[in-house]
Design a protein with these regions (language model features):
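Generic structural signal for residues positioned in beta-strands
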Residues: 54, 76, 102, 121-123
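A short, aromatic/hydrophobic, helix- or strand-capping loop or linear motif
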Residues: 25-34, 102-106
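Non-catalytic accessory segments adjacent to catalytic cores
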Residues: 84-121
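Conserved donor-binding loop and adjoining core beta-sheet/short helix segment
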Residues: 10, 17, 31-86
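Acyltransferase donor/substrate-recognition loop-hinge adjacent to the catalytic core
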Residues: 1-6, 10, 111-138
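Short amphipathic alpha-helix that is part of the acyltransferase structural core
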Residues: 1-28
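Structured helix-beta-strand junction loops
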Residues: 21-22, 40, 97
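Non-catalytic surface loops within mature trypsin-like serine protease
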Residues: 57, 81, 107, 124-128
């Protein structure tokens, strides 16, 4: 079951462990990094931190919304064995108080939902040796 967790109720160790178990662990979703770039961030948590999704919200003119914080290229669902269905379930679990969202999901979170715009993202895979990386360039 996916639940909304306020910042002060998030277990930082379990959160970070879920991020690190992801097929694409990213510093952008680590609790210490979020504390620096988006103080007061909240999150969605599946079961006992099996999967997690950071939520960075604000309020303007009485309207709550989600946004991508500065210095965070991607957010999305982090955990072990993330599927398209899990991503959709997380998106459905975003509290209704957020009337608008402009967030960048993980590059592996490819979903087809009306109103969701897919954008091109270019990443450099650093888990290869330097010669392999160089061979991809002219």
């Amino acid at each position: 079951m996916i639940r909304f967790a306020l910042n002060e109720n998030i277990d930082r160790d379990l959160w970070d462990a879920a991020v690190m178990q992801s097929s694409q662990p990213m510093v952008y979703a680590m609790s210490w990094y979020l504390d620096l770039v988006a103080p007061g961030w909240d999150g969605l948590v599946e079961d006992d931190y099996q999967s997690v999704m950071p939520l960075v919200g604000a309020k303007k003119f009485g309207i709550h919304y989600l946004f991508q914080p500065p210095f965070c290229q991607q957010h999305g669902v982090f955990g072990k064995g993330i599927s398209t269905d899990i991503v959709k379930n997380f998106l459905r679990a975003i509290p209704r108080k957020y009337r608008f969202a402009e967030i960048m999901l993980n590059e592996s979170d490819t979903i087809d939902i009306p109103g969701v715009e897919m954008l091109t993202n270019i990443t450099l895979q650093l888990d290869r040796d330097i010669e392999n990386i160089r061979s991809g360039y002219n």
